[in-house]
Regions:
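Short, basic, alpha-helical segments at the C-terminal edge of helix-turn-helix-like DNA-binding modules
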Residues: 37, 66-73
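Amphipathic alpha-helical segments used for helix-helix packing
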Residues: 59-66, 97-117
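Amphipathic alpha-helical packing segments from all-alpha helical-bundle domains
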Residues: 95-100, 114-140, 148
Length: 192
């Protein structure tokens, strides 16, 4: 009787982990232009064809590594108010993304423009964070703005100014954006 082979992605996950780890280490040490697929493959213990098959090219690999670095490790901070939650999310976001490392991560994500997969994942991280904040607001009896509107009013202007480097996106600017939001409507209490 033949044994059933169970493939839960173990080997695939190990390969991805090894390639990502080597790529991150090389990016920390070397200029991007000095990093090659064969270099990554050798240090990760895989063949270059494995990397090309999975990621297509080095730009897509950099984008995949950037997405992994940008993945949130926790839900947005719960401050007890929608404004506080948005501020606690937005200020560190702007600081991180406007740093040299953050700017490079943005460039890496945008390198994958052919498929848009990397950018889509990063965008979803933001929507997920705003959805958590909105759920908390509703639990407090508030009617929050839709996540799409928060992206348009908060995240989009920050990213625009980061990409075009035409102004600082520090705490004062982030608070100005927050001040421009319409007030969160309190849900009417239903008499029991």
């Amino acid at each position: 009787m033949a044994r059933e082979m169970v493939r839960g992605g173990g080997r695939s996950a190990r390969i991805q982990k090894a390639v990502h780890e080597v790529t991150r280490k090389l990016l920390d040490r070397l200029e991007r232009s000095a990093i090659t697929v064969p270099m990554i493959a050798e240090q990760a213990g895989v063949t270059p064809s494995t990397i090309y098959r999975r990621w297509g090219d080095i730009g897509q690999l950099f984008a995949d590594v950037a997405v992994e670095r940008l993945r949130p490790v926790a839900e947005p901070e719960d401050t007890g108010s929608t404004r506080g939650d948005l501020e606690a999310y937005l200020l560190p976001y702007a600081e991180e993304m406007s740093s040299p490392v953050g700017q490079q991560l943005i460039r890496d994500v945008l390198t994958d423009a052919q498929t848009g997969v990397a950018a889509g994942k990063c965008c979803q991280y933001t929507y997920d964070a705003f959805d958590v904040i909105a759920a908390r607001a509703r639990a407090r009896g508030e009617e929050p703005l839709p996540s799409e509107e928060l992206v348009d009013r908060l995240v989009a202007p920050i990213n625009y100014h980061i990409l075009f480097a035409d102004r600082e996106v520090g705490p004062a600017y982030c608070r100005q954006l927050l001040d421009r939001l319409p007030p969160v409507a309190r849900a009417k209490a239903v008499a029991a």
